[in-house]
Regions:
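Short, ordered loop/turn segments at secondary-structure junctions
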Residues: 12-14, 43-48, 81-82, 114-115, ...
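Short glycine/serine/threonine-rich phosphate/pyrophosphate-binding segments
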Residues: 16-26, 50-51, 92-95, 115-123, ...
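Accessory alpha-helical/coil subdomains and C-terminal extensions
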Residues: 100, 111-113, 121-123, 127-134, ...
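Short coil/turn connectors at secondary-structure junctions
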Residues: 2-7, 35-38, 71-74, 104-108, ...
Length: 225
């Protein structure tokens, strides 16, 4: 019989309204498969928690506490903006991760984040196998930008899309009420980097006679138009 292994879960990058719901899903599902997965450790402040061996034993939390994560905003275990360098630039960081995983009998690595987190999962999987301690590295998608490949609607995007749609609607009402003597243009800058999904959400507002101009990063801006 294969040895039962523990799991490690970490949150990465900017938190969203639903990242804790993903954490809840990982922990609750692991608890349903106690024959295969032992404890679920969470990294305090993301992947840094693994590098510093600062782990939270979620098995000490009640079922009610874990279930409450579904409706808890922000990042319950702490997140970080810490990008692991490439294997060539700093192999030691990856080796340190695997050392900690080995010390705590961790065979499953759940990394909740964006594209960089997916890349980290791939590298950890490759190196751990080369080191003779193969780890199942699973990327749990999370990004408000909605820019992950082969992902139609990423967890986190729906919440921010609603927020931007409501904010655009409220701003347009402000402009309409003040346009006679004051503000005639209201500029809203949103996140998204090279993807225009969040910007596009501003177009979800109802047609109330106020023009909404949306500029997408995918389309070159022509000032003459």
């Amino acid at each position: 019989m294969a040895k039962k292994m523990n799991a490690f879960y970490a949150q990465s990058g900017g938190v969203t309204a639903v990242i804790n719901a993903s954490a809840c899903g990982v922990i609750e599902t692991a608890r349903k498969h106690k024959d295969k997965i032992g404890k679920v450790y969470a990294g305090r402040n993301g992947i840094i928690g693994a590098l510093t061996e600062d782990l939270i034993d979620t098995s000490k939390e009640s079922a009610a506490a874990i279930a409450a994560l579904r409706s808890t905003p922000s990042g319950a275990f702490g997140s970080c903006r810490f990008k692991l360098k490439s294997l060539e630039a700093n192999k030691r960081e990856y080796e340190r991760l695997i050392e900690v995983f080995k010390a705590h009998n961790i065979g499953y690595f759940f990394y909740n984040g964006g594209g960089d987190s997916a890349d980290t999962c791939f590298k950890v999987s490759q190196l751990s196998e080369a080191m003779g301690y193969p780890i199942q590295a699973i990327h749990v998608p999370k990004t408000v930008d909605n820019d992950l490949p082969i992902t139609d609607c990423c967890p986190g995007f729906g919440s921010v899309a609603k927020y931007i749609a409501v904010s655009t609607l409220e701003a347009s009402y402000d402009v309409r009420s003040m346009a006679k003597t004051s503000t005639k243009v209201f500029v809203i800058e949103v996140m998204g980097r090279h993807a225009g999904w969040i910007a596009a959400a501003g177009g979800l507002v109802e047609d109330h006679g106020i023009p909404v101009v949306i500029l997408f990063p995918e389309i070159e801006f022509d000032q003459k138009k």
